[in-house]
Each structure stands twice: as structure tokens, then as C-alpha cells.
A protein has these predicted regions:
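Bacterial N-terminal signal peptides
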Residues: 7-15
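Flexible, processing/modification-adjacent segments and terminal tails
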Residues: 23-42, 49, 94-165, 240-256
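Gly/Pro-enriched, hydrophobic low-complexity segments
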Residues: 148-241
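Short hydrophobic/aromatic-rich beta-strand segments that constitute the beta-sheet cores
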Residues: 48, 75-79, 97-101, 107-109, ...
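Boundary at the C-terminal end of the N-terminal hydrophobic targeting segment
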Residues: 16-24
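Bacterial N-terminal signal peptides that target proteins for export
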Residues: 1-7
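Short, surface-exposed beta-strand-loop junctions and turns on beta-sheet-rich folds
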Residues: 83-85, 105-107, 116, 185-187
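N-terminal mature ectodomain segment of secretory-pathway/periplasmic proteins
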Residues: 25-103
Length: 256
């Protein structure tokens, strides 16, 4: 009898030791799921154009446009308009961030937390295309968001230098498309959130996504970010992801 009980007790102990997210998430391992969902929107090697409209409580809107190029965990974002913001650029190489000031060759180190271009988009918002690089992920269950059936996840920052130590993310069950994210302060107060307002598909891939960032404390202040002409690439030159590239001033390699 004792011999029969030992395996059962061992199995029960092992089951209790498993984290709830690993045990309950219906689609298996969480990290591969999250990484696949990220890459479904923006492939590991890709380029796209981006337009951002900032709305302020003062009633003055601001518009800028540019492009970004992604190579796995490396991203470069370059403004092409308006003239006052031309050549403003952000470079992310893993955990290293650089900023190029508009209309100059000055390049400085910056951080994920800064909001170099202003508005509701931080440097990390413009260069974070791999969630698991910055956050550990736990499954919280299924929940409706924006009227859609979603998986809800809790993201905890791996690095204290990130602006938001805690994030909640909702991904639509049927499509694996992002629906909403809420960003919290250390004390648990919601600071901002984003909602995906529109997605355009071409066959089985995303070619355009419209995201609205909202200041949770001042909801009249928003940043509307549109990524369009999302194009998968077979190869991306390494030269784009260096400080020297930003300093060169030759920042319009979009057609390669």
C-alpha cells in the first residue's frame, strides 16, 4: 500500500509545483505563443512606415511620419517629416538605446523609459517588437476586451530601467492579434493603455495596424500610431543598427 502511495504523492507534489500559467494556458508554452503573436504582426526581419498623431489637451495636434526596420531584437526608427523632425532617429540594439537629434549629427545614449519624441509613446513603445525580451509573461485567463474574446497575460519587467514594471496584455483568441495593453506604475496605478483600432490583412499577414495610446490620467491626451506597408524581408544589413549609421546622416535606406 505504501509503495502505491509514494508515486501518487510524488505526482501530486510535482503538479502542485508547476506554475499556474504553465499548467493552465490552453495553447501550451506561453513564451513561444507570445513570440509567435509578436512576429505575426511584425516579422523578425521586416520594414514598415509609421505615422504618429499626438493630441494634447491644449488642442494642438502634432503629426510626424517615418519608417522603421527590424532585425530580430534590433530596431531603427527614423522620422522623415515634418521638416523640423527630419532625421530624428531611435536605435535599439538589444538593451542599448541611442537617439539622434533632428537636423543634427548629434547622437546620444538614451533609455527605454524616455519619450524622446514626446506624446504618449515612449522609446520602448517605438522599438519593442519582442515582448519576452523585456518581460516575463504569466497567463491570467480568458477575458473580454473591446468586445473580443481574449487571452489575458501579465507582463513583469525583467529590467528596472523599463518605464512600466507591470503590463496587462490582451490577445484575441481567434486571430492571435493584439487587442489592448494597460501599463501600470510600481504602485499598481494605471498610467496609460493602448487599443488596437484597426488591422488590415493581405492574405494571411498583417500589412497595417492602427494603435491608439491613451493617457489614463488625462484621457484627452493620446497618440495615434499607424504602421503601414509592413513588409517581411529575407535579409537586413547589419549597418543600420550602429551608432555610426545614425551619425552618418544618411538615414533613408528604406528601399533596399
Amino acid at each position: 500500500m505504501r509503495a502505491l502511495l509514494l508515486p501518487a504523492l510524488l505526482a501530486a507534489a510535482l503538479s502542485a509545483a508547476l506554475p499556474a500559467d504553465a499548467e493552465n494556458f490552453p495553447e501550451g508554452d506561453i513564451n513561444p505563443y507570445i513570440e509567435a503573436a509578436d512576429a505575426f504582426v511584425l516579422p523578425l526581419y521586416c520594414k514598415a512606415k509609421m505615422a504618429i498623431t499626438d493630441t494634447f489637451s491644449s488642442g494642438q495636434d502634432r503629426f510626424s511620419e517615418g519608417f522603421f526596420i527590424r532585425k530580430d531584437n534590433k530596431v531603427v526608427f527614423v522620422n522623415t517629416a515634418p521638416a523640423s523632425q527630419k532625421n530624428f532617429a531611435l536605435l535599439r540594439n538589444e538593451d542599448l538605446f541611442y537617439q539622434r537629434f533632428a537636423n543634427t549629427n548629434k547622437v546620444v545614449k538614451t533609455s527605454a523609459t524616455a519619450s524622446a519624441r514626446g506624446g504618449e509613446t515612449s522609446n520602448l513603445d517605438l522599438t519593442r517588437f519582442n515582448t519576452t525580451l523585456d518581460y516575463t509573461v504569466a497567463y491570467l485567463g480568458r477575458e473580454k476586451a473591446a468586445g473580443k474574446d481574449c487571452y489575458k497575460f501579465e507582463l513583469k519587467a525583467r529590467n528596472r530601467k523599463l518605464a512600466y514594471g507591470l503590463v496587462h496584455a490582451w490577445i484575441e483568441v481567434a486571430t492571435r492579434l493584439p487587442v489592448k495593453r494597460s501599463f501600470f506604475a510600481v504602485a499598481g496605478k494605471e498610467l496609460k493603455y493602448y487599443l488596437v483600432r484597426a488591422v488590415t490583412m493581405k492574405g494571411s499577414r498583417v500589412v497595417q495596424m492602427d494603435i491608439e495610446y491613451v493617457d489614463a490620467l488625462r484621457p484627452e491626451e493620446t497618440s495615434r500610431l499607424k504602421m503601414f506597408e509592413i513588409t517581411p524581408l529575407k535579409n537586413v544589413p547589419e549597418q543600420f543598427f550602429t551608432k555610426e549609421y545614425l551619425e552618418s546622416g544618411r538615414l533613408y535606406p528604406y528601399d533596399f
